[in-house]
Structures are given as structure tokens and as C-alpha cells.
Amino acid sequence: MDRLDIDKKRAIELGVRYVNIHWKSVIETEVEVSVLSGGYSSRLYLVEDTSTSKSNPIRKFLVRLYGGKIVTGDDPIRPEGGEVKETLVFYAMDLAGLGPKLYGSFDGGRVEQFVPSQMLRDVGYDQRSETMSELARKLARFHSLDLPISQERHQVLDVCEFYLEKRDFEQFRRLAHHFGFMDVSRFEDLDVKSEIQWLRKVEQLVNGRIVTISGDLNKNNILIRDEPDKFGERVMMIDYELAARDYRGRDIGQVFAYKVLEMKDDCFRICCEYPDETWRRAFVTEYLKQTKSLNYFEWDEKLDNVDHVLMEAEFFMFHSIHMITGIFINQKEDSVFYNMPADMVLSMLDFGSYFINMYHQRKALFIETYGKLLNLIE
């Protein structure tokens, strides 16, 4: 388990200052602080009052400390604005009833509401038929947020080119071999430069609406609440480190791509196949239905129809795959990977390799499906 970067005394101080004055009567021996997660650029801790007293109305809260372990502060994957931007998004989600309450913000982190919930699992889509449609509606509401953040589009392909220029395959090969991941051919054979050129060309042809996106819709960032929210829904999106202005298709494409991936026993596992067209079409249909009801832009039937948004999602999903594999390939001699459990690192390299293979398969299918429409086939 990670070492704690926050002690019990500091946890109580934050509880008193931002959560509820009753935390003043809590003593250190009655407090438990545990690690929940370490994201791209922050770490999350659960603080709990374990006393038998019933006087404390809020017995659990979360502390998020900025400063991640996989991505450094100057990594271009992080959109402009950093922690200030992320806190603004979090607060806006709170006010809109879309996410947890923001109790307070301090230098180096923030204090958040603990919402009893569990991470989305693929089986959750089957066990609860509303899950997929609720996620589609939540995403549509998120995209409609009008936020005081940079209105310039976050250029993911620029990030991918940055990774391309900085990568060192010898260092990556040593890291992979250190953990027993011997076949790195998929990573080495991916012609990133040519692929980025192709993506830049096709990006202009696909087009789509630019909105406020989450930028990181893996299942760890999608929770199923124990109790419904004000919309009567249980799906909740969290973690807005990568929120920015970009094409809506990037978020929707991530929902599709990341459906195949989830964590089990602290390792990433491929849990299912890429969602079929029926599933994808149902998701986009619900997304557009909710989007139209929000009425935050002038509707265009040529752009805002199911077929076009499906095309957007299928294309902009490619950007996310390049971004993920770029992060992996750019791990250096001082990479945090060396301090992680071997099984965890192997699982990340496995899914990186799987995603590269999925990229080639989905790209071929994209050209087959949309090649004539976009004049990609002569």
C-alpha cells in the first residue's frame, strides 16, 4: 500500500475547517486515514471517524492531494489551468447536482464529500439496464457546462507528438523486460508519426461539436451510487483532472474503448469485447436526446444525429489510445513503474498492447465504414 501523505492530525484539521465543527471533538486514535487511489496527477484519501459517538453528522470525507505519481506537473496531457481548473469543474458539478459536494479547497489539495458507491463494472450494465442510459445523460449534462476555463481546444495530437519526440525505446524496453514483459513489438511497430499525420487529416473531415469534456472516462472514474441523486440516477462521474474543451466524440469514444477494461485485484483486466453497434447506437441516442433537451446550442440535424456522433466517437477514440500508449512508452529510468507491484505494471503493459491492436482493428473498420463518405478511399 502507498505510504500516507496526510497524517491524522492534518486530517482532523481539515475536517474542522471545511467539513463540520464536530470534527473538533474527534481524537487521533478515533481517526482512520486510508488510500483510495492515485490518479494521473493527484492522490485520494478517505478520512473516517471510527468513534462510537453519534454527534458527528459527517463521519467520512475525502482529501485529494495534488501531485500525481504517473504524470508530472509539466506533462502536456494536463490541460491548461491545472488544479484551479479542476476545482472549478468539481464545484460546478457540485452545484449542478452531478457530483460530490466540494467542502473546501486549500493549497495543495481539496476536501470532498464521500458518496457511498462502487466503481462501475461491465457486469453492472447487465445487472442494471438503466446504467448505460444514465451514463449517457450524465455525460450530456457534463458537456453542457459553461465553465470559466480555457476555451481553446486541448490539442491531444500535440501531446502525442510531444511523447513521440521524447520517447526512448531502449529505456522502455528495459522497463518492460524488468517486469517480464518480453514482447514489445506492438509498441515498437506502431508508426506513431504517420498515424498522427493521418489523424490530423481525418480530424478536419470528421468534425463535430467542441464541448467541455471529461477527458478520462475509464471505469474507475464512473461510480454507481448506493442511493440515487437528485435526478433519480445512480451513475456519477468523478475525477476531472483532464477536463478541457475538445470534441465530444473523444469522451463518447472513451466510453466505448474503456468498456473493455476494468480493475480486478488491483490489476487492469480485459473484461469484454468492444461494444457492438446496437449498444453504441443506444448510448448515442440517449446522449443526443438529453443534449437536445438542454438546449445550449443551435441544433443542426446534419451534425447532431446518431450516425454522425457515432462516427465522431469511433474516430476520436483513436486519440485516447495514442495518448495512453504515449504515456507508457515515455517512462524513464526514474519511472514510478519501478516502485509499483509487478502484476500491476504487467497488466498496464498488457492492456497497452491490447489497445494498440484494437486501434489497428478499429481504424480498418472505420475506413471501411466511412472511407467513401470522407473521401479516404480513392
Predicted regions and their residues:
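Juxta-kinase regulatory segment immediately upstream of eukaryotic protein kinase catalytic domains
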Residues: 1-35
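ATP-binding pocket architecture of kinase catalytic cores
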Residues: 34-36, 40-191, 202-209, 232
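Hydrophobic alpha-helical segments that form the core
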Residues: 159-166, 314-327
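Catalytic-loop of the protein kinase fold
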Residues: 212-214, 219
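Catalytic activation segment of kinase domains across protein kinase-like and atypical kinase folds
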Residues: 222-261
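Active-site activation/catalytic loop segments of kinase-like enzymes and analogous catalytic loops
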Residues: 249-298, 318-336
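ATP/Mg2+ or Mg2+-diphosphate-binding catalytic cores
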Residues: 293-301, 320-378
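All-alpha amphipathic helical-bundle segments outside canonical DNA-binding/catalytic cores
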Residues: 296-318
